């Protein structure tokens, strides 16, 4: 192309040869489902949580098994209105 704007003679068209047999573009590859399961299992981890009972102020240990996103949600709930009560205080009420 010469000049600032293209003209019709600047455009070159090529003939695409046609095939007598159609080309199959379908991909017959299948993913192994165990890879997806392994990935999901890797995302789930155990977390140890040490918090304080809101009634008697004793330490309460929790172990949860969840994804990182879920542990972040739990953290936000603990910072909000969610309170943990120890088993002794739970029996009293």
Curated annotation (Swiss-Prot):
Residues 1-42 are annotated as: E7 terminal domain. Keywords: Activator, DNA-binding, Early protein, G1/S host cell cycle checkpoint dysregulation by virus, Host cytoplasm, Host nucleus, Host-virus interaction, Inhibition of host innate immune response by virus, Inhibition of host interferon signaling pathway by virus, Interferon antiviral system evasion, Metal-binding, Modulation of host cell cycle by virus, Oncogene, Transcription, Transcription regulation, Viral immunoevasion, Zinc, Zinc-finger. It is found in: Host cytoplasm; Host nucleus. A motif (Nuclear export signal) lies at residues 71-79. InterPro entries: Papilloma_E7 (IPR000148). It comes from the Viruses. Highly phosphorylated. One of its GO terms (molecular function) is protein domain specific binding. Gene3D superfamilies: 3.30.160.330. The keyword DNA-binding applies. A zinc finger (unnamed) spans 53-89. The keyword Transcription applies. SUPFAM superfamilies: E7 C-terminal domain-like (SSF161234). A motif (LXCXE motif) lies at residues 25-29. Plays a role in viral genome replication by driving entry of quiescent cells into the cell cycle. Stimulation of progression from G1 to S phase allows the virus to efficiently use the cellular DNA replicating machinery to achieve viral genome replication. E7 protein has both transforming and trans-activating activities. Induces the disassembly of the E2F1 transcription factor from RB1, with subsequent transcriptional activation of E2F1-regulated S-phase genes. Interferes with host histone deacetylation mediated by HDAC1 and HDAC2, leading to transcription activation. Belongs to the papillomaviridae E7 protein family. HAMAP family: PPV_E7. This is Protein E7. It comes from Human papillomavirus 42. The lineage of its organism: Viruses, Monodnaviria, Shotokuvirae, Cossaviricota, Papovaviricetes.
């Amino acid at each position: 192309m010469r000049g600032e704007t293209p003209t019709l003679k600047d455009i070159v068209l090529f003939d695409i040869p046609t095939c007598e047999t159609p080309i199959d573009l379908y991909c017959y590859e299948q993913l192994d489902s165990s890879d997806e399961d392994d990935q999901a299992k890797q995302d789930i981890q155990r977390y140890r949580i040490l918090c304080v009972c809101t009634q008697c102020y004793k330490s309460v240990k929790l172990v949860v098994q969840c994804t990182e996103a879920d542990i972040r949600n739990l953290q936000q709930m603990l910072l909000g209105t969610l309170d943990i009560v120890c088993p002794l205080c739970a029996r009293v009420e």
